[in-house]
Amino acid sequence: MLLHYILKAYMKTTLIQLSPHQMSNESLVPWGRLFFQVIDLQIPKDAVPADEDERERCEWWKAKKWAYATLGRLYRRYGDPSQLPSTLKEDYGAFADSFVNTFAPEIIKVFLHQVELYVSGRVWLSKKCQYHIFTFFSDCIKPKSTWHLIKPHFETLVSSFVYPQMSFTHAKVELWDTDPVDLVRQQVGKRACKPAAFGFKLTTSQMMVIISIPPSLLQRPSSSSW
């Protein structure tokens, strides 16, 4: 399948700069729609391996990984005017203003929907896709323009998605018993999920919400409400 190579190639073109064409709506909108369609694609079970490690490496999930990564990269590098380096403001200032107001809200909506599906058990997410979701949400916390879109979902996002990543689950216990080196690699490796990075960027009031979550989880059945 060529799709994941196409998405990977596009991602690589954004690493250093965006061309005027890439910043135009004639290019950005259709590419954005493609990324959203790939992320939203419901993959039939018989189209991917049953083994989760093999599924991580299959073409469909590589395509999804590059879709998540590219959307996050566009926002983090070029699309957030409040975090744009002064050396880039002249070339990308206008693009960032447009991106954060028109495109970033759609990315947030799509990512939140995938998290909702994941925590409710309706879809599976690869570890690398989760990594890119965590990274994107971490980048969206500080800027007011994106934080106000995430804030209504904040408590549920932390309790249902972030906190479980920090918990020592039965699967992690088994891996610790059989291969502790692999467990450490997964938790601190380059592509490990980033709940810690998410937490570091929170204000004191937001941190108080997080601190109250573990006791509340012990007092009620596991559930999610979006």
Predicted regions located by residue number:
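Eukaryotic non-catalytic interaction scaffolds in large regulatory proteins
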Residues: 1-2, 6, 14-15, 19-31, ...
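Structural signature of alpha-helical solenoid repeat scaffolds
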Residues: 4-16, 72, 76, 138-139, ...
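Alpha-helical scaffold segments in carbohydrate-active enzymes
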Residues: 5, 37, 66, 73, ...
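Extended, noncatalytic alpha-helical scaffold/tether regions
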Residues: 6, 10, 30, 38, ...
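Alpha-helical repeat/alpha-solenoid scaffolds of the HEAT/ARM/MIF4G superfamily
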Residues: 14, 22-25, 41, 45, ...
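Short sequence/structural elements of tandem HEAT/ARM alpha-solenoid repeats
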Residues: 21-37, 48, 81-94, 98-113, ...
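Internal amphipathic alpha-helical repeat/solenoid segments
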Residues: 47-59
